[in-house]
Amino acid sequence: RAIFNLMAAVRRNCNEVNAMKIIKAKSYQDLSRKAANLISAQVILKPECVLGLATGSTPIGTYRQLVEWYQKDDVDFSRVTTFNLDEYVGLSPENPQSYHAFMRRNLFDHVNLAPERCHVPDGCATDLARACREYDAAIAERGGIDLQLLGIGGNGHIAFNEPGEAFEKDTHIVALKESTIRANQRFFASADQVPRQAITMGIRLIMQARKILLIAEGPAKKQALEQALFGPISAQVPAS
């Protein structure tokens, strides 16, 4: 049976391991609204919370819903801190295809998030290894991530953690698989313009979040989602 719109909310901490709630949605709009409701509830519950944010096509509707609720004074982001999962290596924040630009277009420029509280990995750092360490340190300094939003790639990747990547990694540099490059080609003029490397939070760091919200939409994600939810835990399916 195809799973067309599904949201898996996962809560993990030292006392509650592998407790998962699967929420089915009737449509993409319904999925986006339900995801936004969980995020806004986190912000209302803890106004100074730390959110982990994702890019890609799936969370766009979630961000639009959050913007709408902000404009209606239903949610206040003024004390929230955000950390994005990843960024392409070599793309400046001003590049329209960078994830810095994506977040500005879809969320940051439309709500009252303080710019100094919005963090995206620096894919143009002269010392990428140091940039990775500093990103991890910044997250730790703020007490870790309260709620992490995730999408899932067609090959089961989350963030830019590709199949085969070790789970025991924090923020690091990764070479992108050809399947990921092809999937992201639609955002660029040609496949040649898609960066071949990215800086990404690792699985270990992602799993340290107190709550994880994974959203998936469309039949193209069906196989990866089923493997992640119902298959064995494997580095070949990072989302598992």
Task: Please place each PLM-identified region on the residue numbering.
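Ligand-binding beta-strand-loop-alpha-helix segment within the catalytic cores
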Residues: 75-148
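Glycine-rich phosphate-binding loop
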Residues: 143-169
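Class I SAM-dependent methyltransferase SAM-binding "motif I" and its flanking Rossmann-like core
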Residues: 159-203
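Glycine-rich N-terminal segment of FAD-binding domains in flavoprotein oxidoreductases
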Residues: 45-71
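Short, Lys/Arg-enriched N-terminal segments with co-localized hydrophobic residues
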Residues: 3-6, 10-19
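ATP/nucleoside-binding phosphotransfer catalytic cores, i.e., glycine-rich phosphate-binding loops
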Residues: 201-204, 208-240
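N-terminal glycine-/serine-/threonine-rich phosphate-binding loop
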Residues: 18-51
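Short beta-strand segments
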Residues: 52-56, 84, 121-122, 149-152, ...
